[in-house]
């Protein structure tokens, strides 16, 4: 593609198309695409979703966008509002740098503690019942702000909230870390 933003849109469109295809459903069986990205007006998600014949909910939650799409999609299915949802997100290192830090065109030197935004896209289809992975619970995190303002070290800004959310989840669910095969966080 000619721009980083168009490349991100193409990646997300491809991820959505592949997720629907691998689910064994056709596009007309999808009731909603729930997606987000890091760009202004979530344009990658919006432009990717416009190619599909279903509703679209655009979400923005920075590094936690994919988790938010799963929570919203699961709640809509569990509530009986929809039957099938695509949950998706994307990011592109170069478009994120342009928007949040230093445009690559400036040739700025990156500080050693700066994080690297992934260039990639992912999507899955949520449906009630069936085989495979199950969404059984969600814990919505709260903001824990220690006053970190360094745009090159957002991991330090996000880590307290991520830790607080995990601790809250274990307390509320009565589970322990060893009850899980894998614990991952979208936070840096």
Predicted regions located by residue number:
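Active-site nucleophile and cofactor-binding loops and adjacent substrate-binding regions
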Residues: 6-8, 55-67, 114-116
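Acidic, glycine-rich active-site loops and adjacent beta-strand->loop/helix elements
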Residues: 36-41, 63-64, 89-95, 141
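Condensing-enzyme catalytic core mediating Claisen C-C bond formation in acyl metabolism
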Residues: 1-5, 103-167, 172-175
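Conserved active-site "lid/cap" helical segment
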Residues: 1-34, 38-44, 51, 161-177
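Internal helical hairpin/lid segments
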Residues: 182-188
């Amino acid at each position: 593609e000619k721009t980083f933003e168009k490349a991100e849109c193409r990646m997300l469109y491809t991820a959505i198309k592949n997720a629907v295809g691998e689910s064994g459903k056709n596009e007309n069986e999808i009731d909603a695409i729930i997606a987000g990205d890091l760009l202004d007006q979530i344009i990658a998600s919006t432009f990717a979703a416009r190619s599909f014949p279903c509703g679209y909910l655009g979400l923005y939650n920075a590094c936690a966008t994919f988790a938010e799409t799963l929570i919203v999609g699961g709640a809509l299915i569990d509530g009986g509002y929809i039957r099938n949802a695509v949950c998706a997100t994307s990011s592109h290192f170069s478009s994120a740098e342009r928007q949040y830090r230093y445009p690559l065109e400036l040739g700025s030197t990156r500080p050693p503690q700066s994080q690297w935004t992934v260039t990639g896209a992912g999507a899955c289809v949520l449906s009630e019942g069936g085989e495979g992975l199950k969404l059984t619970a969600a814990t919505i995190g709260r903001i824990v702000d220690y006053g970190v303002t360094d745009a090159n070290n957002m991991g330090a800004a996000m880590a307290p909230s991520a830790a607080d959310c995990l601790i809250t989840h274990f307390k509320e669910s009565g589970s322990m870390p060893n009850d899980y095969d894998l614990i991952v966080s979208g936070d840096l």
